[in-house]
Amino acid sequence: MSSDMAADESEAPVLSEDEVWEFCLDKTEDGGGSPGSDVTDTCEPPCGCWELNPNSLEEEHVLFTADPYLELHNDDTRVVRVKVIAGIGLAKKDILGASDPYVRVTLYDPMSGILTSVQTKTIKKSLNPKWNEEILFRVLPQRHRILFEVFDENRLTRDDFLGQVDVPLYPLPTENPRMERPYTFKDFVLHPRSHKSRVKGYLRLKMTYLPKNGSEDENADQAEELEPGWVVLDQPDAATHLPHPPEPSPLPPGWEERQDVLGRTYYVNHESRRTQWKRPSPDDDLTDEDNDDMQLQAQRAFTTRRQISEDVDGPDNRESPENWEIVREDENTEYSGQAVQSPPSGHIDVQTHLAEEFNTRLAVCGNPATSQPVTSSNHSSRGGSLQTCIFEEQPTLPVLLPTSSGLPPGWEEKQDDRGRSYYVDHNSKTTTWSKPTMQDDPRSKIPAHLRGKTDSNDLGPLPPGWEERTHTDGRVFFINHNIKKTQWEDPRLQNVAITGPAVPYSRDYKRKYEFFRRKLKKQTDIPNKFEMKLRRANILEDSYRRIMGVKRADLLKARLWIEFDGEKGLDYGGVAREWFFLISKEMFNPYYGLFEYSATDNYTLQINPNSGLCNEDHLSYFKFIGRVAGMAVYHGKLLDGFFIRPFYKMMLQKLITLHDMESVDSEYYSSLRWILENDPTELDLRFIIDEELFGQTHQHELKTGGSEIVVTNKNKKEYIYLVIQWRFVNRIQKQMAAFKEGFFELIPQDLIKIFDENELELLMCGLGDVDVNDWREHTKYKNGYSMNHQVIHWFWKAVWMMDSEKRIRLLQFVTGTSRVPMNGFAELYGSNGPQSFTVEQWGTPDKLPRAHTCFNRLDLPPYESFDELWDKLQMAIENTQGFDGVD
């Protein structure tokens, strides 16, 4: 033990409880109390009675609880000496510098609650603070416990939690000066108080009872062990030797434990590319079949994402650019149960073709998650018809059923050899000459903004078995006599035919997209196709070598022709789409160290600033990823990866603002926002940033001589600008430059600037289907709103009346990304872990709605009509950038 440590932890002279009481009574007389009176009568918790330091008789905390139970059991009470010595290896929580830790010591009774509490002094800028403060408590050993909570003092926001230790008092030893080795300190492992807490390190404590009635022999042989479950270490000689907590069970194969940029521990399943907060156990290890099911689920979710033009053009007027191949279905395609004995239509809806081709590809490849037996007919050439597959009837997810534009899900329009149109219901495997009746309502062809004021009479008749009634308070509700239930929502609002073609989007992303497609130049001096022969097990390495081996990037604009080793199949677009899904899964996997999850959730990505430490050729890989992204945009395909908003802004060479930081790192945002709105001079901040790398803290100057420049009211805007530049731009400048170099080899930089950052995400990742019912089911309400509130009814009515793009825009507005978690809105994440979508009543009707992307919260004023809510919500979504209400 070092000399300074020994000096800090020198043993105090032993005082009996009677001596302590005598001293307190003397102090009572000096302080004006009545001689001989009970000390507890003059004490008011949580304050201490009098102050005493048994080492030097200088003032120090001596606390006696005012628990009435003590008076009845005075013979059972003891005085415990608690010494808070030090903290070791605490977590760093202060983003503007080292932590400022202090300890709150609370004596409590599990039955009656807190008895008294005291706080140590704050040690500035230290992760290994030394307090050396003593406290005396009068306690009932069998009833009372002491809770030690460590916090990081923060002037900008609330104090950060660094860990806690809860110690029972009955097993503590009694001080005995005759012992050759006096009782020494113990290091307690700091524990979290919830799964969201990020803690590490130890709290060094010394806890002993004073001898009772002057008896030095009492409990001399008492064991010094605490109750089972606490990890401690008795270390009289080696202060640097730390205890090790019990080894947790090993992770299942393919799993890895990591910490995000906020220090939160999460677990990565590299086989399924999934993450979770809960530590998996070997018993939770997924079978191959389970992994295949999740893989197929991810593929299905990826397949349903589309470009804006894929679901709005009819089959008759659809253009056939090079990136979309029109495929004729073979006449002999059969469905078990009832075959459709008629030729296919001359044009197949693109979304329908992609779904069929993707399913066919999975079946041909023998995907273990696909259990249908497949029989394939021979084909003579690559340009021939699609191979015929006969599938045994299996449950099929509706999302993959072929669907023609303008028809209900699962319905497809076809033509026979005479050119007559008929309709296939893939849900029931039946055909009919009649167009589905739910589409016959002519109102479905009128945009919602041209229908005039929304009225129940405009929605047509109620479905069979439904009745509309008026409640005593004037609100309208609906009765479903079929199942004998009532609800507030109008069932007609869920009729896609009535609410389908909603308000055309004023930003007109569709027109931008079509203009963009027309301006992309088709190369005439390149081969007809670009072939890639790949191995599934080495798809990243094979793709990297093939694409980076091309010196002239224009060759990548040729039609993609992809073959997987050992598989026979035709690539009419489906295999290329599958390749983009698989290569995205590999490129963006944090396992390779090129990307990492953002601070907000575990499904949006950002470039890893330390990627060079993981891969020496990281810049070459970023150029490769840029080329792949450019190929996806050029060929009209999609990437399975969603990035933070500043990433898209950097691609567009737009300035990143403080607002962009909120959805990425809420702690940084809150701190910088406070600095912007207040005078930071008293904080003694400098133009430096502390960065932790592999457990060591490094200082980075934001400008030359920054360590000597104090942040004041005059230069705080410059400080905030430099922090944002460092956080998003400077640290990844080389990686981003390599990515853009590869991307702009295929896509003209000036042409991409017609989009904003939200539209660029849709261009690269596509539009997904938002399940409004799932969204609504996993929504919380605050500050007066509830599921049955009239404004909430109007809000969900508005969401149901939106088209797919507008719903995605609303999702981007409130969460910062167009990505819905694979398992739905139940797994939506915010800055502090799982965070459900929340609608909170706020403001007055003259205000626009505002969003808090780090909390997935929408502040919605109490509007007085549906039309007012509709107009204000549209305005807020479309004018996010210049809208002060969004923070």
Curated annotation (Swiss-Prot):
Its EC number is 2.3.2.26. GO terms for cellular component: cell cortex; chromatin; cytoplasm; cytosol; glutamatergic synapse; Golgi apparatus; membrane; nucleoplasm. Brain. The keyword Repeat applies. The active site is at 854 (glycyl thioester intermediate). Residues 217-549 are annotated as: Mediates interaction with TNIK. Pathway: Protein modification; protein ubiquitination. GO terms for molecular function: beta-2 adrenergic receptor binding; ionotropic glutamate receptor binding; phosphoserine residue binding; phosphothreonine residue binding; potassium channel inhibitor activity; proline-rich region binding; protein domain specific binding; RNA polymerase binding. E3 ubiquitin-protein ligase which accepts ubiquitin from an E2 ubiquitin-conjugating enzyme in the form of a thioester and then directly transfers the ubiquitin to targeted substrates. Specifically ubiquitinates 'Lys-63' in target proteins. Monoubiquitinates IGF1R at multiple sites, thus leading to receptor internalization and degradation in lysosomes. Ubiquitinates FGFR1, leading to receptor internalization and degradation in lysosomes. Involved in ubiquitination of ERBB4 intracellular domain E4ICD1. A cysteine residue is required for ubiquitin-thioester formation. This is E3 ubiquitin-protein ligase NEDD4. It comes from Mus musculus.
